[in-house]
């Protein structure tokens, strides 16, 4: 009924506000004095340039870009294009650390990049694939990012050839996606060991559900010692249209 729908929308809005408050708090806890941090990084970057250390300059710029994006207002939306750029900066940093041990392969349809999405949905999933998938590999680690536009939907696939996840872990994530007692579920399923962004996979899933009014779908395929695939199906909301 219309009344039930109204109650559901109010609950979802309340939960979204709660999520945003928590994310803002985490952001505030992490930033301390962001202007000082960014100014310092800018100075170091210029010093690296003057000393001819181009790789170091580029690395510092990537770190600053990711930090600035992670500390931005979580109320604003992004485009997939902005999300992809942050992922590329993240991989530049990781490949600086690990060299050819890890390869990043992307196949992206340009007309999908203007789609409007909640901020910080790709980097946490990519980071999860790296940390829990391929980071331990001495060679031949791969993470693939695939983005396409199909039938008024955006399809995003994040595929790694890493260690995979136990069936129990996958089932927990799947049950979380289908959980209807939203606020209780979020409180009882907070990430116990957050990744460096402070935003875990479950948080990303929940924000997708709230932003798209449960019209987003998430699929997970995983096999131990073979890898994991996260597949997102999200409505094609074009920014500015």
Features from the language model and the residues they span:
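Two-component histidine phosphotransfer core
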Residues: 1-221, 229, 233
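Generic C-terminal helix-cap and adjacent flexible tail
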Residues: 236-241
């Amino acid at each position: 009924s219309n009344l039930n729908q109204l109650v559901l929308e109010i609950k979802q809005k309340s939960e979204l506000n709660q999520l945003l408050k928590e994310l803002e708090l985490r952001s505030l806890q992490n930033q301390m004095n962001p202007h000082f941090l960014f100014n310092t990084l800018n100075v170091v970057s210029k010093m690296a340039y003057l000393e001819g250390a181009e790789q170091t300059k580029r690395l510092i710029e990537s770190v600053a870009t990711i930090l600035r994006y992670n500390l931005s207002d979580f109320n604003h939306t992004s485009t997939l294009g902005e999300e992809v750029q942050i992922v590329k900066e993240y991989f530049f940093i990781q490949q600086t650390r690990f060299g050819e041990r890890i390869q990043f392969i992307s196949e992206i349809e340009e007309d999908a990049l203007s789609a409007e999405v909640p901020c910080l949905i790709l980097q946490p999933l990519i980071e999860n694939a790296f940390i829990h998938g391929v980071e331990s590999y001495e060679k031949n680690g791969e993470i693939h990012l695939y983005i396409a536009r199909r039938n008024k939907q955006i399809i995003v696939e994040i595929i790694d050839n890493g260690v995979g996840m136990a069936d129990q872990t996958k089932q927990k994530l799947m049950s979380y996606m289908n959980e209807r007692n939203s606020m209780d579920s979020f409180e009882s399923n907070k990430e116990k060991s957050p990744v460096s962004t402070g935003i875990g996979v479950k948080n990303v899933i929940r924000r997708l559900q709230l932003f798209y009014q449960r019209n987003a779908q998430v699929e997970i395929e995983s096999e131990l010692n073979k890898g994991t695939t996260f597949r997102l199906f999200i409505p094609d909301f074009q920014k500015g249209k």
